[in-house]
């Protein structure tokens, strides 16, 4: 699956997810942070699921109907576990993400919000 990792996601997650067969771009490799709205736009344009720790992306998608290609928000996981958790969500919820779902993942809990604004 094509992914765009937000700068707040541990940089080591890029290599781990790439090794698992995903096509991964990490915004931390860029010379500057384009900001939330532009980052979500890039993910939508490139049809990449955005992976973040930041709840602002959900607000952009839900309240402001900013188009996206799916969002995974990781809450409460140590940096070194982010890729593992993301990989489990990608494997278990591929159809939902392909349909533009916003998935919030916390230890012991997964919340899925289908999106009508998917790219």
Task: Please annotate each region the language model reported.
Residues 1-13, 106-119:
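Metal-dependent nucleic-acid phosphoesterase active-site entry motif
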Residues 2-48:
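N-terminal first-folded block
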Residues 14-15, 36, 60-62, 83, ...:
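Short glycine-/acidic-enriched loop or helix-start segments at secondary-structure transitions
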Residues 18-19, 37, 65, 83, ...:
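Ribonuclease/tRNase effector modules and their secretory precursors
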Residues 28, 54, 74-75:
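Short beta->alpha connector loops at strand-helix junctions that form conserved
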Residues 43-61:
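Acidic, metal-binding active-site segment of PIN/NYN-like and related structure-specific nucleases
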Residues 71-113:
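C-terminal structural segments of small proteins and small subunits
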């Amino acid at each position: 699956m094509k992914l765009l990792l937000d700068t707040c996601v541990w940089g080591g997650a890029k290599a781990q997810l790439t090794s698992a067969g995903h096509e991964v771009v990490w915004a931390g490799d860029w010379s500057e942070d384009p900001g939330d709205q532009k980052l979500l736009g890039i993910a939508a344009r490139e049809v990449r699921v955005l992976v973040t720790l930041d709840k602002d992306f959900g607000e952009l998608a839900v309240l402001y109907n900013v188009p996206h290609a799916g969002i995974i928000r990781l809450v409460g996981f140590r940096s070194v576990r982010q890729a593992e958790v993301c990989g489990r969500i990608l494997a278990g919820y591929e159809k939902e993400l392909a349909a533009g779902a916003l998935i919030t993942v916390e230890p012991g809990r997964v919340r899925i919000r289908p999106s009508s604004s998917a790219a």
